[in-house]
Amino acid sequence: MGALLEATVENRYAGDETKQPPIGYIWVFNEAAWLTQAQADAWLLARAADLPAGCVRGCAELSPETYIKKIVKIRQAIADGEIYQVNYTWPLDVTLYGDPAQVFINLAQAQPTAYAAYIDMPEYQVLSLSPELFFAVDGDRIKVRPMKGTSPRCVDHEGDQAQAQALKASEKNRAENLMIVDLLRNDLGRVAKPGTVIVDSLFDIEAYATVHQMTSSISATLNTRRLTALIPALFPCGSITGAPKVAAMQKINAWEIAPRGLYTGTIGWATAEKIQANVAIRTLVLDPPTGESLAARTGILGVGSGIVWDSNAEAEYAECLLKSDFLVKPDPGFTLFETLRLDLPAAELEATLPLVEIYPRYRGHRSRLSAAAFSLGFGFNEEGFESILWQVKAEIREKAPGNAGIKSYRVRIDLGHDGTLHSSWSALPPLADRVALIWATERLDGFNPLLRYKTSARSLYDAAIEIAVAQQAFDALFCNQAGLVCEGGRSNVFVKEGNRLLTPPVRCGLLPGVLRAELLARGEASESLLTISDIKAASREGRLRVGNALRGLMPAYLK
């Protein structure tokens, strides 16, 4: 929309207007229901599906190397006197699991902001957690509060206060903020009565769940309240363009890798007396639902930062990623866990053995848990993980006399969203040489991203295993909605073809097991689509295998 309001900024869709998305939507209502926060939450909850809901950490569409090259161009333009600052942005691909309405509630509760918005339309949804006011009108008074300057939060209070004070004292951030204040004073002058534009405050620090933000406030008395005058004068907000505004917009149009869409636009409302509009940052725009999955949606989150002459490209890239951390801030209500095999050594050898000799696949479990924690926003400390495993070993040794003759144990470590670790263990009894399998009656949603992680949200698996055990079987095999074989409730499935093992690819919808990863890395297994017929034939011919890190690879057959 900014390009359409400013004739000197080229329209990216010029010559092919059929591809241009709508520049905006306006809805007019005869009446509106004004809800309290609790009423709004209850309204949304009543429409949300009862599923775990959250976000997987976004995947950057712009590499650090390409970003650095873009920053070099911006700094050259600043050196040439073409611009003073550019707010350079780029998109992240984001995957949601669960209902978008529940995701929005979780995000809003974890990071309350004054200008959040949830838009639910048949063809798309918007989850905006914007903390930034574009403008607010009350009678003939208008207020703007640009946001420019970011620093991360700290866990401890003293460190967090130090971060806030450092941001407030930062000459670089104050200079950027003041540059945008001057720009918005100029914009307000277009619609304000002469002499009424006032800077109410400078360099305020606002704390949010993952970041501190620097803001300033400016107000004025309007000479008009018409949106048809306010929008052309003020849009887009200077905090997300740079300065000079038009020159910065021209550079943005030429250098950014994709149109911004709603990101850095505005979402607002208007009545006869009042208007309020946000700057649509921290805003996730979901792709249209495909109808293939109720458990997963994809979307785009824009991130960016203001670039000036002394900006450090690596630091700016890190700041952009930091601004996306709010997506994984809420506790999703489940734990991540790993189930490890512990082989208790002889007491006289115990003190000399490394952890990997006691927990044979320790490294694979640690790697998978660390990766899952990063993707889903869980706190994870590798030293803490190692420490609790040593504690469990000591506990089992202490109680070993009550388990005479048992040398192998099942150890489960649960990781909470806040990084806390809990352990449980039990003896690991032997199994038959060939294990029996049944078919699970439920189908897996192969698009559900949570299937790729080992979480406590696994009632579907637990129920299938319970049925299998009742039928004297080890496990139940699941298929996805397309009828392709995925995995067992507690094992990965393999079919032996000559000297090679075939196992379903992760895209079918399954947990990438630790044993499975080992076999793939060693070249002993490869991914291949498997059908029910493939499994039946392998069972008849003695080529069917299932396996996990706890039990290893086991011959199997269908009951």
Residue ranges and their predicted role:
Residues 1-340, 480:
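Extended alpha-helical targeting/anchoring segments
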